[in-house]
Each structure stands twice: as C-alpha cells, then as structure tokens.
Swiss-Prot record:
Keywords: DNA replication, DNA-directed RNA polymerase, Exosome, Magnesium, Metal-binding, Nucleotidyltransferase, Primosome, Transcription, Transferase. This is DNA primase DnaG. SMART domains: TOPRIM. HAMAP family: DNA_primase_DnaG_arc. Belongs to the archaeal DnaG primase family. Residues 165-241 form the Toprim domain. Its cofactor is Mg(2+). Its EC number is 2.7.7.101.
Length: 426
C-alpha cells in the first residue's frame, strides 16, 4: 500500500465496529460510479481492509478509522473526502474527520536511506582508498574535533565509547585520531600507561567487549603485559611487525581487527616471554638418568616421506625407566605447507593419509574439531599455541598429532596425542 488514510469518528450513540464499517460502505456506494465504489476497489486490491478502533464514552462512541490505499494521490484524497461524507451510523448522527494521510513509501524511503548510510559506513572501513597522505591536512582538523576526554583521568577517546557495546583500547592520543580517521569511533587510549592502568579502562572492560590494539613492537607487548594482568580484555590486535597503530592505513587497521587473538591465549605467549621459567620439581628417582618427557627427533627428509619420532615417558612398574617411542611419517610436501603457516594465524586439518580435510582460522579450530567425528582428523597443524584446552579436544576426537608454533603451559598431557613445533620440522 502507498498511503494510510487516518480519520477520527464520533457517533452520538452506542454502536459497534461493524455498524461503522457498514455505514462507510453503504453511504459511499456508487457516489462516483460503480468503478469507484469502495467494495469494488477493495476487491481489486486498490484499497485495503478498513480498520476501526472504538471506545464508548457515556452515550457516545468515539474512535479511529484507518483505510490503506494503493491509489494515486488524487484518488486517495477523493476516498478520504468520501469518508467524511458519512453523516449517520444506524439511527445516530456521526461525524468523520480525516486528520492525516501517511505516505508509506516516504517512511520506507527514509528507512532505506538510513540503512544505506550504515552500509556505506561499514563499507568505508575496509574499502576506503588509501588517500591518507593527500587528505591528512584536511581531515586532521575535522577528526581532531571528534576526540573527547573520557573519565576522571581525561583519557583521549572517540565519541561512541559510552554507546558502543565494544571498545578498542589503544596506547595514545595519536592512535585514537588515526582510528577516528577511518571511522572507528569506539576507541579509547591508555595515554602511554606504564605500570598503572587507568581505573576507567578497567571498569569499561568489565561491562563491554574489550579489544586491546597495540603497536607491533616490544613496547606494545609491554603494554599488553600490564593491561592483561588487571583488565578483563577479550581479544588482542597487533599492528604489523615494526609498525605503530598511529601510522596504519585503513586497510591495515581492518586486517588487524579481523585477525584477533583471544587475550588468554596471547597472555600465555607473554608469560613465556617475560616470566622466568620456573624450576621443575622432580620426584626422587633411582640413579639412572631420566629421559626427557618429550624429545622430538629432527626429521630426515627422504625422497617420499619424513619420519618424526615422538618420545614419551611411560609409567614404570620397576625402578627401570622405560621409553615409548611413536613414529610419524610426514611427507615432505606437508612439511613445506606447515612451514608456510607461520604468521598466517591459520590451521589445516589432515586425515591419516595426510590429505587436507579443512583449512580454518586458528580462532575457529577448536569449534571445528568439536563438530568432527572421533578419528576423522589424524593431525592438526596451526599457527598458534598448544594449550591444555587444545590437547583435551584432540584427545577426545582421537587426533594423533598436533603441530604448532609453540607450546604453552600444560598441566595434564594425554598419552595418545603427539606434539611437535614448527622448529622441530626445520
């Protein structure tokens, strides 16, 4: 329907809805010929169902009449005037007055325009041509005006930090300005925090999805190290190695925010980097030398396959230590593909014949494995960390081998899952 005719009705007596509808159709019948009769127009779909909403006040009936119209503007106005020609409902005097004709298409156009603006904004985040150097002087004055001071610490921030369910935490004011330039308005800065994270950031991270976006250098890791210890951060995004957030282009920012790393997983990387390795407490053993819990043997490349031995310590029933050795034959072509995974944040699932089953993002590999039938996946190679959670799902799904970038903190090791790192294959 194109239009909605809205009218008020007053009847000097108590009547029902069907009395009013009958009066409208009866008193307008053939006023302008059979072709413009309301019943005929309704049968042809030119007007919609007449809607009447009434209530009784003392001895009077008042209410509203709504008639949807698919006619043009002139014909719709004529139908509206016909409604006002109704003078009686049953034996009682009545009065109908049209108070509005709503253009349904105008409302629809308004919704379309608003949606188009939203689509353009989202599209611009990733598709904007890299004209930063050309437009820097012009846009700087506009974008600087959007930087606000947030919280008692007066932290530099974008205008949507309060409204958005998600915030992006960066280091300084220059980072905020750069992200605002490309349309990211839910950004807030630590303002060069060292040692003490602002209380405002800690409170925001408790109630919103928080992404920490830092420079791709050692300084960025130091900030993350302090931030992740006190704030409930959900994900980590890093600038490309050697680059700062304030100098990234729109495409580089979008790429970094697509390749998010779970904060808990990145904290394990930082713990290995910044914390001293704890001394390993060993139980008293007979004087015989102890073999390592896991000793990957460097694979020797053969014309067709590579053999990798994974050594595990078996539980001895006697003082003598027994060693269980499992051998994995990895084709050289697979080794080359695994080496290429470094830096991609991707994972490849293989069957027992080393045929690729699926290639997924590292952050999705756990969920993909959860849906797999036990025994279908033989090995998983991924650019990530071997965590306890990953080992547990591998054991549950009968995965025989995990090949990853590095090994995290592991409390309990499943006996039937082998572990190798990328460095073991070089």
């Amino acid at each position: 329907m194109k239009y909605l005719i809205k009218a008020k009705i007053e009847v000097e007596g108590l009547v029902d809805r069907h009395d009013i509808i009958g009066a409208i159709f009866g008193q307008t019948e053939n006023l302008f010929g059979e072709e413009f009769d309301l019943r005929k127009l309704q049968d042809r779909g030119r007007i919609g169902r007449v809607q009447v909403d009434i209530k009784h006040e003392g001895t009077r009936t008042i209410g509203e009449v709504v008639v949807p119209s698919n006619l043009d503007r002139v014909e719709t106005a004529l139908v509206a005037a016909m409604l006002e020609s109704v003078e009686k409902v049953g034996p009682y005097k009545a009065q109908i007055r049209v108070y509005d004709i709503v253009d349904v298409r105008a409302q629809k156009i308004k919704r379309i325009v608003e949606r188009a603006k939203e689509i353009l904004r989202i599209w611009s985040l990733e598709k904007t041509p890299d004209l930063r150097e050309v437009l820097r002087e012009i846009s700087e004055a506009v974008k600087r005006a959007e930087v606000i001071e947030y919280g008692p610490e007066r932290l530099p921030a974008g205008p949507d930090v309060d409204k958005s369910d998600e915030i992006i935490i960066v280091e300084g004011r220059a980072d905020v300005i750069n992200l605002l330039r490309y349309g990211y308005r839910n950004v807030i800065a630590l303002e060069g925090a060292r040692g003490k994270i602002p209380e405002t950031i800690i409170k925001l991270a408790k109630t919103k999805k928080a992404i920490a976006f830092v420079d791709g250098d050692h300084g960025g890791d130091l900030i993350l190290w302090e931030l992740l210890k006190v704030a409930d951060i959900d994900y980590v995004a890093k600038a490309p190695p050697g680059k700062e957030v304030e100098e990234l282009t729109g495409k580089e920012i979008a790429r970094a925010l697509r390749n998010l790393i779970p904060a808990r997983e990145y904290l394990q990387i930082l713990e290995r980097k910044f914390k001293p390795k704890p001394a390993v407490e060993e139980r008293p053993q007979p004087p015989q030398p102890q073999p390592p819990a896991v000793q990957p043997v460097q694979p020797t490349l053969q014309p067709t396959v590579t053999t990798v031995e994974v050594v595990r310590e078996a539980k001895p029933e006697k003082p003598t230590v027994q060693v269980e050795v499992e051998t994995f034959e990895i084709p050289p072509s697979v080794i080359e593909e695994v080496k290429k995974l470094s830096g991609t944040l991707e994972a490849v699932l293989y069957d027992s014949k080393w045929n690729p089953i699926e290639r997924v993002s590292v952050r999705d590999v756990y969920n993909v494995l959860e849906k797999m039938e036990p025994g279908k996946v033989y090995a998983v190679a991924y650019d990530g960390i071997v965590t306890q959670r990953m080992l547990d799902i591998a054991a549950e799904k009968q995965v025989r081998l995990l090949i990853a970038n590095r090994i995290g903190n592991i409390e309990k090791r499943p006996p039937k899952v082998g572990i190798l790192t990328f460095s073991d294959l070089t």
